[in-house]
């Protein structure tokens, strides 16, 4: 008997199943109740459901539809040892074997085409698997060369390819049993009534799922005369919607005013997916259909939509009223992924705080692109203080430890293709078990980062490896050349010398010799595996690869033991599966790597954790009712686009009802989520482009939901509004735009900011309070260096020196590529040294050799070009400096300015004033530094012009000042310094840029005309925001923490600070 229980509630259907089990118990107490579904999460839910009813859940057996069908094949065909040898892997290798034969595809015979062969074989294996399940009659007819002419000539190569696979399988005496011919055999046995009923299960329950295809349904229908089959069919539609949907049309041209159900694309999409059940199950008069629908009593928008699906009333188009207080459906437009999770967190807090009936376990968050959100989820949900923590669980396919082991395995397997970039190699030491294997401590790993930067190790093991990668054969920037430098440095005892064309480093001493040895050992093992993995080998050779790899790289312990076993088991399964195809040629590890990771992640290992907010993929919800369902990442990229490789897929050319369709599946999952949400359905997506903040459209499914609501609902009094006007009002109400700085404007989670600052800054003292810090600022002695450093960047100095807060030293970022260009920091250092050598008439040839061997200059003519260009530029500056540099006087100072004592050193005092020089352009910080020194020089009686010479002979100078005036100015800057310790002073580069535009030197005033103001503000904003080539001042971490928003209030403060402190500098320009 085939009985269909049809309902819009999973709990109703499970209750029916429970009553059947209770009312008709098996005579054999050991016989298990069988449930068939394609996701273990539902089985987990079923066990909890039954346990709540009965007090215990036992004697249940869960089957995936594929597994159960093969179990039936074994029973009905009396083949206990029956195996499905036509696996995806087996078909791949069979096709590769065929492609190796020149007779089949002439253009795929070369060895260098191995990866192309694999990709083609992988694609065709996937397509053939679909043919076997969805067109078994094709496969059976092809094998007996029947009805081939119905296919176009340019499609018949697929038939020949399949025939070749079957021929090769029989050739090596392997079974040619696959689903298609077993399906045919079972149909024959059922027709002949030769089934032995006693071996079949007495009854089983099937839950409607994506894995149900027409062939499976036909088998179940045919055996229902021998056993009781209960089909639990979950659908929001009480009546059959298919009478209202045109065949083979998902979307129709919507005529807004036409009252037709076809306008409801959401309903159409769901209906298209459910056609399989209507045509293969519900239409059959042999089957018994029992409706068990429940109407939603709630009057919310969400409940009314579900009732529309349930009732006949949705066809009349009588609009229902939408309450302004109704928040059961919300659509949130966010700035980026982090912001999207921040907004979600705040919303979940509201759900939990305002609804005592909602617990964390009543909430599920789904996304089609969950992997891309994991880091943001962990960051936001783990950063909040304990009082506001929401327990959560991310349903990943592997444990965290297994994910790390898989990452390491993938990295090592990729060594054959690797350039051995420094960061890529050092990342392996971030895995504790690998670091432990080679005996590296955390401190030693930090030292390695420093060594690699100093020795300019970039990529490549040695010159041979570079040659293998088809690059010029030289040892510059390679690992072993860098190690030579380290060994020479150790031998030279902390001195910097050139020996045999190698420059030693001055930072190595004898105490670090052991660390050099560890590094050599680590690189040698990596080199061994690079060579091993670069060679083609037989499949049998690769079988033991994982155990060998673990032995060489990992310190075995109980923490990773289980993960090692999981991965090793899967690796051996993949190899054994491949060996069953009897492929006898050598193969690249790259192909096995692709197969392994595809197969590993293709399996569904997801679980739910009770009592917490679960993050998962939409298909894991499995009709399970939740009070709150949130869908994140629903932008226009969340639905898969057309796969152009499907041009090979004949199912697309000759479609039938029940064919798998990814687009329909994603659409169905979206509407299923809406249907399973009991109280709230929350949607969010990123609505702004990362590039230029332009508008990004949501998924078409979100648009269709809005369209459906617009067609069926309106606010009170809006009954006569046009579709367009009604759409505007509803969209404005349901869609909320969230700003980038969401958290700074949210009172409920202020603690996040504090945690954020703690994460971003390193406190050098514990339990620091602002009051205590300010009390310490009573010392009247001021070092000139401190005064200058403060005025160069007041906000940074405020954090560093008085709050004792500094940016946390993140893991050192090292350059990964060889230096064709000199990085800005090295360029600055080289130019300064070069200018110093030219001014002091030192040997610049030796300096060039030093920088070339150190690796800081690019190799060969790249370095020569840089050096020659900068010699010319530095000579121009040096000539200008030498023009003014007559004396080299240096003076210690100790000045009393009222109650303050200033001490320090003034250097390069000339008879004409102070002289300073630099290799780059003169900035506002250089001006203010020279200005403060010039004030002290003037107080001491100096009467010359102080000047600074910069790039391209640029000169900034200050005119002579009398002592009294200089004293007054300096006192003001000292007072500003003291005040700047108590609260941040908004003196910035942006403010200086603004002032340069508005200050009138001739009249010593601020220009207030409209044109000048606009130009000045544009310059300020440009300096603050930057562009694609120049980093804006807003990226400065200290400013970012102080000036969180560039609003009118903050811009005014920036301009006022610039006006007060920088006008004296412009006014006294010489």
Swiss-Prot record:
GO molecular function: ATP binding; DNA binding; DNA helicase activity; exodeoxyribonuclease V activity
Organism encoding this protein: Buchnera aphidicola subsp. Acyrthosiphon pisum (strain APS) (Acyrthosiphon pisum symbiotic bacterium)
Entry's family note: Belongs to the RecC family.
Subunit structure: Heterotrimer of RecB, RecC and RecD. All subunits contribute to DNA-binding.
Disulfide bonds: none
Nucleotide-binding is among the record's keywords: yes
Role description: A helicase/nuclease that prepares dsDNA breaks (DSB) for recombinational DNA repair. Binds to DSBs and unwinds DNA via a highly rapid and processive ATP-dependent bidirectional helicase activity. Unwinds dsDNA until it encounters a Chi (crossover hotspot instigator) sequence from the 3' direction. Cuts ssDNA a few nucleotides 3' to the Chi site. The properties and activities of the enzyme are changed at Chi. The Chi-altered holoenzyme produces a long 3'-ssDNA overhang and facilitates RecA-binding to the ssDNA for homologous DNA recombination and repair.
The encoding gene: recC
Protein name: RecBCD enzyme subunit RecC
Gene Ontology biological process: double-strand break repair via homologous recombination
A Pfam family the protein falls into: RecC_C
GO CC, alphabetical: exodeoxyribonuclease V complex
Keyword annotations from UniProtKB, A to Z: ATP-binding, DNA damage, DNA repair, DNA-binding, Exonuclease, Helicase, Hydrolase, Nuclease, Nucleotide-binding
Additional record remark: In the RecBCD complex, RecB has a slow 3'-5' helicase, an exonuclease activity and loads RecA onto ssDNA, RecD has a fast 5'-3' helicase activity, while RecC stimulates the ATPase and processivity of the RecB helicase and contributes to recognition of the Chi site.
InterPro entries (alphabetical): DExx_box_DNA_helicase_dom_sf, P-loop_NTPase, RecC, RecC_C, Restrct_endonuc-II-like
